[in-house]
Amino acid sequence: MKLISCNANRPLSDAIADYLDMRLTRSEVKTFADQEIFVRIDENVRGEDVFVIQSTSYPANDNLMQLLIMMDALRRASARRITAVIPYFGYARQDRKTDGRTPISAKLVANLISTAGADRVLTVDLHAGQIQGFFDIPTDNLFGGPVMVDDIKERYGKEKIIVVSPDVGGVVRARSLAKRLDDADLAIVDKRRPEAGKSEVMNIIGDVRGARCIMLDDMCDSGGTLANAAAALKEHGASSVSAYVTHGVLSGSAVERIEKSVLDELVMTDTIQPSEHALKSKNIRVLPISPLLGEAIRRIANEESVSKLFDR
């Protein structure tokens, strides 16, 4: 087995290698003056089971091309099997047609990954679960929940908490976490616009008065949804509001928005390399995802069950 990393999140690749007590295969990924990407693998990979680690986060197109070109190089170098390890799968929010004459970009990206040479895909918390079906190759979609459950239990102990979905679409994800937290109570933030031209109203489904609320979402991009939901929960009497997300996209001024909000804490994993600004923020904390990914890679390499990782 060999591990190889592109440039999107090298610290995560190093941490996965440490978990597996391996070293990363030597390679070079560089960008020419005209912005073309060049890849070279500096070790023999013939007949090897290779895992390529690369999140397709910002800059999404550059990171996607790095992954595609790296897999093409591995295929031409006669690697026996290529697994694309994509902790954060970019373009996942473009999983369906939202209007006439619009693309389904997530499906296109899935096709590109397969065509470039991937034999299987390993990813974490796809924005929409059906994206697994976009691939015609085996695809393992890991759940970040266990990482969060351990942290929540450590920090809150026996305190009564309520798991909150920041929107109706995330209820299934929130319910799954609540079950892992000894069937914790569940609440939902329901955003509604009463009529055209009127501002959005936050309705809270569930009683959060005096409760410690744990919001769960797959990602935090602009931070607006979580900040607004936290304000609504506090207005309805929540004693504290923390948010747990798998992917800290944190676009634009998201860090400042989180810091200015009433959100007590944003906890995210490192599927995307956190910026220095995020790391220094007193409101943001990062959980390592490398043990989960490393164990999944070990199981795939040894032909063991990946789903048993979540049998608890």
Curated annotation (Swiss-Prot):
InterPro entries noted in UniProt: PRib_PP_synth_CS, Pribosyltran_N, PRibTrfase_dom, PRTase-like, Rib-P_diPkinase, Rib-P_diPkinase_bac
One MF term in the entry's GO annotations: ATP binding
Family in the record: Belongs to the ribose-phosphate pyrophosphokinase family. Class I subfamily.
Residues reported to bind ATP: 34-36, 93-94
Assembly information from the UniProt record: Homohexamer.
Pathway per the UniProt entry: Metabolic intermediate biosynthesis; 5-phospho-alpha-D-ribose 1-diphosphate biosynthesis; 5-phospho-alpha-D-ribose 1-diphosphate from D-ribose 5-phosphate (route I): step 1/1
Source organism phylogeny: Bacteria, Pseudomonadati, Pseudomonadota, Alphaproteobacteria, Hyphomonadales
Subcellular location: Cytoplasm
Keyword S-adenosyl-L-methionine: no
EC top class, as a word: transferase
Cofactor(s) essential for the protein: Mg(2+)
Catalytic residues as annotated in Swiss-Prot or TrEMBL: 191
HAMAP family: RibP_PPkinase_B
Its job: Involved in the biosynthesis of the central metabolite phospho-alpha-D-ribosyl-1-pyrophosphate (PRPP) via the transfer of pyrophosphoryl group from ATP to 1-hydroxyl of ribose-5-phosphate (Rib-5-P).
Organism: Hyphomonas neptunium (strain ATCC 15444)
Superkingdom of this protein's organism: Bacteria
Protein name listed in UniProt: Ribose-phosphate pyrophosphokinase
Enzyme Commission (EC) number: 2.7.6.1
Record's catalysed reaction(s): D-ribose 5-phosphate + ATP = 5-phospho-alpha-D-ribose 1-diphosphate + AMP + H(+)
Keywords on record: ATP-binding, Cytoplasm, Kinase, Magnesium, Metal-binding, Nucleotide biosynthesis, Nucleotide-binding, Transferase
GO cellular component, one term: cytoplasm
